[in-house]
UniProtKB/Swiss-Prot annotation:
<keyword id="KW-0687">Ribonucleoprotein</keyword>
<dbReference type="GO" id="GO:0022627">
    <property type="term" value="C:cytosolic small ribosomal subunit"/>
</dbReference>
<comment type="function">
    <text>Located at the back of the 30S subunit body where it stabilizes the conformation of the head with respect to the body.</text>
</comment>
<feature type="domain" description="S5 DRBM">
    <location>
        <begin position="9"/>
        <end position="72"/>
    </location>
</feature>
<dbReference type="InterPro" id="IPR000851">
    <property type="entry name" value="Ribosomal_uS5"/>
</dbReference>
<dbReference type="InterPro" id="IPR005324">
    <property type="entry name" value="Ribosomal_uS5_C"/>
</dbReference>
<dbReference type="InterPro" id="IPR014721">
    <property type="entry name" value="Ribsml_uS5_D2-typ_fold_subgr"/>
</dbReference>
<dbReference type="Pfam" id="PF00333">
    <property type="entry name" value="Ribosomal_S5"/>
</dbReference>
<keyword id="KW-0689">Ribosomal protein</keyword>
<comment type="function">
    <text>With S4 and S12 plays an important role in translational accuracy.</text>
</comment>
<dbReference type="InterPro" id="IPR013810">
    <property type="entry name" value="Ribosomal_uS5_N"/>
</dbReference>
<dbReference type="GO" id="GO:0003735">
    <property type="term" value="F:structural constituent of ribosome"/>
</dbReference>
<dbReference type="GO" id="GO:0006412">
    <property type="term" value="P:translation"/>
</dbReference>
<comment type="subunit">
    <text>Part of the 30S ribosomal subunit. Contacts proteins S4 and S8.</text>
</comment>
<protein>
    <recommendedName>
        <fullName>Small ribosomal subunit protein uS5</fullName>
    </recommendedName>
</protein>
<dbReference type="GO" id="GO:0019843">
    <property type="term" value="F:rRNA binding"/>
</dbReference>
<keyword id="KW-0699">rRNA-binding</keyword>
Length: 147
């Protein structure tokens, strides 16, 4: 695979989580970040980073996202066909839309679809709204699209 130029990618933080560990002296906080990166030209990836500070968690998540890049097949401004995918308790439904419809997506699905470069799509998130599971379900669905 050719070398990837990180400058042409945009990144979006989908979720920041705080985890608390209670110790004898009080509470210890740690953070995790779920980040999506994409070049709006079919390449998109997501990553999870964990650290004691939020900026460090985001940086780790971005590095992880570049290791998990996938290529999304785009037909014109939309996807080629309907697809439904389930990951754990989250189900995602993706449907192609006619030109001019725009991105109709909510929550964690919108940044993925936009950063992939899809301009017209209808999406529906069913079941669990856990951000990580919705992102995984969306990625798996986009990876399964055939031209």
């Amino acid at each position: 695979m050719e070398e990837i130029n990180r400058e042409e990618f945009q990144e979006v933080v989908v979720n920041i989580g705080r985890v608390t560990k209670v110790v004898k002296g009080g509470r210890r906080f740690r953070f995790n970040a779920l980040v999506v990166v994409g070049n709006k030209n079919g390449l998109v990836g997501f990553g999870l980073g964990k650290a004691k500070e939020v900026p460090d968690a985001i940086k780790k998540a971005v590095d992880d996202a570049f290791k998990n890049l996938i290529h999304v097949t785009i037909k014109g401004t939309t996807i080629a066909h309907d697809i439904e995918h389930k990951y754990n308790a989250s189900r995602i439904l993706l449907k192609p839309a006619s030109e001019g419809t725009g991105v109709i997506a909510g929550g964690s699905t919108r940044p993925i679809v936009e950063l992939a470069g899809i301009k017209d799509i209808l999406t529906k998130s069913l079941g669990s709204n856990n951000p990580y599971n919705v992102v995984r379900a969306t990625f798996d669905a986009l990876a399964k699209i055939k031209a």
